[in-house]
Design a protein with these regions (language model features):
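Conserved ATP-binding subdomain of kinase catalytic cores across diverse folds
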Residues: 1-106
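Acidic-enriched, low-complexity/disordered segments with a strong bias for Aspartate over Glutamate
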Residues: 34, 58, 85-87, 114, ...
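Alpha-helical structural motif
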Residues: 42, 76, 115-118, 135
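Histidine (H) residue identity feature
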Residues: 48, 111, 155-157
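Low-complexity, intrinsically disordered regions enriched in charged/polar residues
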Residues: 87-91, 112-116, 120, 133
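Active-site-proximal helix-loop-helix substrate-binding element of RNase H-like nuclease domains
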Residues: 99-127
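Conserved kinase catalytic-core segment
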Residues: 117-170
Length: 170
């Protein structure tokens, strides 16, 4: 069991449609508490199954079960290594698009009725902003994994890129 404190909390203000897990970072390790009771188990199982795919080790994060004590409560959850180094930060696609075009990516995508055109728009828009030429391959892998594991909570607030202080992306 690990005990975590308020200064370690990293929970975002924006909640997903499934609620919001408490998240902390402490000494190079990320911790996520279950919100509905199964998120940690799902992340553990899926991350360990990904070891047997053709994904490289730097393309996913392994999760391990963890009991987390925060304030007076004990949570079931998971831990993983920190995947953000130095001055890199996570920026969601929604925030990235809003910063550049001053409009909601989600709203723009919902106005495109054809699924293929919607995916093409998403890939081209993010490639244009970030210069990430392999973005299409990445997003197709992500959606394939989501479909295989029945992830029903994918949206533009939980797909992200990494950006550093110089404006480089990965």
């Amino acid at each position: 069991m690990v005990e975590l404190f308020k200064q370690n909390i990293r929970t975002n203000i924006r909640q997903s449609s499934k609620g919001n897990q408490l998240k902390w970072e402490n000494e190079g390790t990320w911790y996520k508490a279950d919100y509905t009771g199964y998120e940690g188990l799902a992340e553990y199982v899926i991350s360990h199954l990904l070891k047997y795919t053709n994904l490289n080790e730097d393309e996913y994060v392994l999760y391990e079960p963890e009991q987390i004590k925060y304030k007076r409560q004990i949570y079931k959850g998971v831990r993983s290594r920190t995947f953000i180094d130095g001055d890199w930060q996570i920026i969601t696609l929604e925030r990235l698009f809003k910063n550049v075009y001053n409009e909601s990516l989600t709203s723009v995508l919902w106005h495109i009725s054809d699924v293929k055109e919607r995916l093409e728009f998403l890939v081209n828009a993010i490639k244009k902003i970030t210069g990430l030429n392999n973005w299409g391959e990445y997003i197709c892998r992500l959606f394939t994994i989501d479909a295989f594991f029945l992830n029903e909570d994918r949206h533009m607030h939980n797909i992200a890129v990494l950006m550093n202080g110089k404006g480089d992306y990965k």
